[in-house]
Amino acid sequence: YYLRNVTWVGNTIYASDWLNEQLRMKKGDVYNQKLMTERLTGDEDAIGNYYYNKGYVFYNLDPVEVNIDGDSIDLEMRIQEGPQASISKVRINGNDRLYENVVRRELRTKPGDLFSKEALERSYREIAQMGHFNPENIQPDVQPDPTNGTVDINWNLESKANDQVEFSAGWGQTGVIGKLSLKFTNFSMANLFHKSDNYRGFLPQGDGQTLTISGQTNGSYYQSYSVSFFDPWFGGKRPNSFSVSAFYSIQTDISSNYYNSAYMNNYYNYYSGYGNYYGGYNNYESYYDPDKSIQMYGASIGWGKRLRWPDDYFTLSAELSYQRFILKDWSYLYIKLNNGEYMSTGNCNNLSLNLTLARNSTDNPIFPRRGSEFSASVQLTPPYSLFSNKDYSVYGKDDYDEAASMFNWIEYHKWKFKSKTYTALTGGQKCPVIMTRAEFGLLGHYNKYKKSPFETFYMGGDGMTGYSTSYASETIALRGYENGSLTPYGSEGYAYVRLGAELRYPLMLENSTSIYALGFIEGGNAWTDVSKFNPFQLKRSAGVGVRIFLPMIGMMGIDWAYGFDKINGSSRYSGSQFHFILGQEF
């Protein structure tokens, strides 16, 4: 059968011509009842949703075949629009972790407002993004009341633990090795100073703020400590975020006596057969040298605002940070000076302002099926060299202290862009999802003779930051290649690009555990100068992996990848690589 005429009856809100455009079925088309049902009620931009978004909850549309003539059908679309319904009561059930106002402030469905299906779906998304409730079991129950022309909405939630603990301990050549990290995602700073009747447990909670405390040690050779605080609704009235953090770390070197001892032990081992570690003579722990060290400390303060334009998925944030590096006979930073030496003693300061424009419209923080994420940022230091009136091409050529003073205050401008998109291939909760990724970064300078040795890109491998790799570099993952292999020492990255795609499939989506498998292809590269940036000159890889999310631990997983290209003049391909993943990457 073919469609001949479509007549609309009872419509006053939308014109018949406009409704025909939205129906997308014109005269002469094959009469497709499935397509018609999707355009009337099923699709996101279905005609019914236009009515629901304007509060017409009691709207009804009945398509009637009024005439069948041969192979042609005439349709009459009979609409009962009904009155607009306002929201009467909004109830929240199942919340036993947060203060109720913390949940209510995220809702777009508030008493007195006109009912809107779009607002209902957006409220669902905002609750899921909070991370305190199982996103797979958020159930809005809409109860229309035709008598009063209102609707009640019951939000049925399932609370889940969202705090994270990371603990590891052991013994190695450097002595005691350990790490402890505590992340409290439902902290309440107000209750810390003014205890209320709702004070819960040993730690004040209920306001949805995040407090993170961590410490790490590798015996006497490395120690680091950090603390951070984040409030997504600073002041409690508007979605303006506030953050503050501080850190300190120290790493020391190994005494030259260790290498002499190691040489002698190997000598005796050769002639007398004693093991290299016989009696513990080769342990680093015995050769700690406090006169060779690098200390780092810093702090940051940030503020963010949810925007209304272009839409309210956008946020704008600013962060002011300060870092200080104290070098004491430290020969591993590879800062080459004008006098030909490498900087080993001195102080470096990094004062910068970071501005970020971001947008996140994903539907689920753990296993996104739809939506996108992107961020564009610029990090700037003051252009000290423009005001100093110094010729840095020859500055300090004959004097170490003068040459090292070039880096007392580091200067640079750093530009980054990151994006991800998510597309569900089928409907339902257990559906395959394609994730695509594109990102790049550039580290520029104000003076070509005063390029920053810090804030470079450390590319390759699993993307996890380690204390022994790069002190002030940003770690960029590229699976299929060893950690940092694309930017070895002496070839630091001042520009990078990374592209990729993943096919994900959920194996388990429960409150306590979420597991999904993935297959991926990706490519990327890093360059020692911005002028060498070439997004078509990529190192390629492909592989498979699995991710597991546990509430007390967070996201972790393992990937196997194969690198198809050679790197840094190597005669062999990168080949097979395993990568262990801890944490959720943007």
Task: Locate each region found by the language model.
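Active/binding-pocket-proximal capping segment
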Residues: 100, 124, 172-175, 246-247, ...
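C-terminal beta-signal and terminal closure region of outer-membrane beta-barrel proteins
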Residues: 464-470, 531-586
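Phosphate-interacting basic helix/loop segments used at nucleotide- and nucleic-acid interfaces
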Residues: 42-62, 136, 223, 299, ...
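Short acidic, glycine/proline-rich loop/turn micro-motifs
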Residues: 104, 256-257, 388-390, 529-532
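C-terminal outer-membrane beta-barrel translocator/porin domains of Gram-negative envelope proteins
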Residues: 147-149, 163-172, 328-507, 512, ...
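Interaction-mediating elements
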Residues: 1-130, 134-135, 141-153, 157, ...
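Gram-negative/organellar outer-membrane beta-barrel architecture
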Residues: 97, 116-367, 373, 479-480, ...
